[in-house]
C-alpha cells in the first residue's frame, strides 16, 4: 500500500513513523478536524442504495464473498442477500436460538467466517441462559445449527477467526477474554487473558469502568477495549496462553479512583474505549469512544474515534482524531445520541457509525489529517450501529437500531455506496425541533436533569452502559415488545 505525497512514493509504514519524527503538533481541534470533500469538489449527492426493515436489528457483519450480510436481531438473527446492494433481500430469519433447551435472548452480536456463523448472548446479565451457538451457513438461506456452549456469564460481544472464537467474559469479579475452539462437533474452551491478573489495582474500580466491551483480532493480535482502563493489545498466537503486548489509555487508575460517582466515570469522557480495530496492514489502529455529556468536568461531549500508529505494536503513537457530530442535548437520556459506535478500517478508509449522527467515510491515509469523504444521516428515523464493507469494495452495509431511549425508531439494514459525496438537505442535529418526535425536552449544554443516567440495578449488580431497566425481559416476546416501546435502551 503506497501514498503519493508531492511526487514521492512512500510505504505507509514508513510514512506513519516519518510523520512522527517530523514533529507533529499536539492534537487539537484545528490540527485533527476532518477535511470535508464536498459536492463542489466534483462529487455527487450521497444517499443509501437500499434498506431492509429488521425488527431488533443490532450488529451486522458481511460474509466473505460479499453477497450476504448477517444481522443480530435481539431475539435471533437474520441473513440478507446483498448481492445487489440496491435491493437487499431477506434470506432467512431465525428467532428460536436455544442453549441447552432454553431460549437465547438479547442477541446483539454475531460473527461470521467462511461457512461458520456464531450467535452470542445475552448482551447483559439477567436475561436467562447465556452462551454461544454455531451455525453452518454454507447456504445462507438455510442456516443449520451445529453446536452450542453454555457459559456462566453474559456475552456482550465476540469475534470469529477461523476455528477460534474470542469472547468477552465480564463478571463482577473479572473482565476476561476467553478463547474457544469451534471447529469441531463440540465447542471447547482453550484459554483466557485477564486484565485483573495483570493489573489487580483495577479491581478497586467499578466493574463497568474496566469492562471489556468488545474484541477484534488480526494477525494473531487481539485488540481489547477495556473502557477506562484503555485498549490492550494481546498476543494470541498461542490461544492457550495469551500474552500482553502493550496498551493505550486516556486516563489513569489514580484518576479513576478519584471519581466519586460511577456514572460520571462510566458514561463520560475521558476513557470509554468501546471498540478497537486495525486496518488491513495492521499499522493503523482506531479506538472508538462511546460517551455522553454527564454535566461533569470537561470533556463533556460525545465520544469520537482516535487514530494510533501501531507499526511498532510495542510503542503505539497517537496520530489523529475524528470528532463526533454535535447536537443540542448530548446527554444519555436526551436520546439524541451522536457518539461513536462501531466501525471498520479497510483500504485507507474508515467507515464509521454515530447512532443518530449517521454514517461517515473518512480517508485516513494521513491519520494526522483525516479527510471526510461522505456523511449521511436521518436522525428522525435511524440510529446506526455498525458499518461493514462488502467484498466487492463498492458498497457497505450499516445496521440501524430502534432501541435508543425516548425515541420511535425502526430497526433496519441499509446499504451505501463507497464514494465521495454530500447529502442533499440533511436534517439538522443542532436544531432538531422540526423532526424530533421525542417527548423529553432538550437543553443547550446537555447538562441538568436529562444527564441522569440509568439506575444501576439489575438483580445481579452487573449492568452495562446503555442498558437500563431490562433485567426482567427474558423472553423473546417481551424483549421485542420492549424494543417496540423503546422504553429502554439496547447499546452495544
What are these regions (language model features)?
Residues 1-492:
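Hydrophobic alpha-helical segments
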Amino acid at each position: 500500500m503506497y501514498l503519493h505525497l508531492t511526487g514521492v512514493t512512500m510505504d505507509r509504514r514508513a510514512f506513519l513513523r516519518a510523520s512522527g519524527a517530523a514533529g507533529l503538533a499536539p492534537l487539537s481541534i484545528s490540527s485533527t478536524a476532518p477535511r470535508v470533500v464536498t459536492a463542489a469538489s466534483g462529487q455527487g449527492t450521497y444517499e443509501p442504495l437500499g434498506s431492509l426493515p429488521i425488527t431488533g436489528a443490532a450488529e451486522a457483519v458481511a460474509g466473505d464473498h460479499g453477497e450476504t450480510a448477517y444481522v443480530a436481531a435481539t431475539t435471533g438473527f437474520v441473513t440478507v442477500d446483498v448481492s445487489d446492494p440496491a435491493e437487499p433481500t431477506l434470506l432467512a430469519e431465525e428467532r428460536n436460538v436455544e442453549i441447552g433447551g432454553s431460549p437465547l435472548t438479547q442477541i446483539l452480536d454475531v460473527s461470521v467466517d467462511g461457512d461458520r456463523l456464531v450467535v452470542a448472548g445475552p448482551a447483559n446479565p439477567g436475561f436467562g441462559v447465556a452462551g454461544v451457538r454455531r451455525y453452518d451457513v454454507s447456504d445462507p438461506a438455510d442456516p443449520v445449527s451445529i453446536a452450542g456452549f453454555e457459559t456462566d456469564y453474559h456475552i456482550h460481544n465476540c469475534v470469529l477467526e477461523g476455528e477460534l472464537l474470542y469472547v468477552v467474559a465480564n463478571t463482577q469479579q473479572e473482565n476476561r477474554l476467553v478463547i474457544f475452539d469451534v471447529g469441531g462437533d463440540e465447542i471447547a474452551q482453550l484459554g483466557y487473558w485477564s486484565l485483573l491478573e495483570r493489573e489487580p489495582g483495577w479491581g478497586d474500580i467499578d466493574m463497568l469502568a474496566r469492562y471489556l466491551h468488545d474484541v477484534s483480532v488480526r494477525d494473531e493480535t487481539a485488540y481489547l477495549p477495556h473502557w477506562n482502563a484503555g485498549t490492550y493489545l494481546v498476543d494470541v498466537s498461542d490461544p492457550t496462553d495469551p500474552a500482553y503486548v502493550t496498551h493505550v489509555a486516556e486516563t489513569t487508575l489514580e484518576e479513576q479512583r478519584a471519581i466519586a460517582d460511577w456514572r460520571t466515570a462510566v458514561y463520560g469522557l475521558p476513557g470509554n474505549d468501546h471498540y478497537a480495530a486495525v486496518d488491513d496492514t495492521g499499522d493503523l489502529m482506531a479506538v472508538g469512544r462511546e460517551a455522553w455529556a454527564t454535566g461533569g468536568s470537561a470533556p463533556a461531549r460525545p465520544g469520537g474515534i482516535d487514530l494510533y500508529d501501531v507499526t511498532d505494536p510495542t510503542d503505539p503513537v497517537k496520530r489523529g482524531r475524528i470528532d463526533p457530530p454535535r447536537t443540542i442535548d448530548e446527554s444519555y437520556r436526551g436520546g439524541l445520541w451522536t457518539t461513536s459506535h462501531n466501525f471498520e478500517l479497510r483500504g485507507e478508509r474508515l467507515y464509521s457509525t454515530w447512532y443518530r449522527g449517521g454514517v461517515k467515510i473518512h480517508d485516513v491515509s494521513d491519520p494526522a489529517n483525516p479527510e471526510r469523504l461522505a456523511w449521511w444521516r436521518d436522525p428522525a428515523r435511524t440510529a446506526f450501529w455498525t458499518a461493514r464493507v462488502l467484498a466487492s469494495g463498492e458498497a457497505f452495509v450499516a445496521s440501524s437500531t430502534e432501541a435508543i431511549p425516548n425515541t420511535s425508531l425502526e430497526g433496519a439494514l441499509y446499504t451505501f455506496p463507497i464514494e465521495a459525496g454530500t447529502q442533499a438537505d440533511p436534517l439538522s442535529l443542532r436544531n432538531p425541533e422540526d423532526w424530533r418526535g421525542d417527548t423529553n425536552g432538550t437543553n443547550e449544554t446537555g447538562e441538568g436533569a436529562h444527564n441522569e443516567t440509568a439506575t444501576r440495578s439489575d438483580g445481579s449488580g452487573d449492568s452495562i452502559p446503555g442498558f437500563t431497566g431490562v433485567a426482567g425481559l427474558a423472553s423473546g416476546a417481551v424483549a421485542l415488545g420492549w424494543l417496540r416501546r423503546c422504553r429502554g435502551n439496547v447499546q452495544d
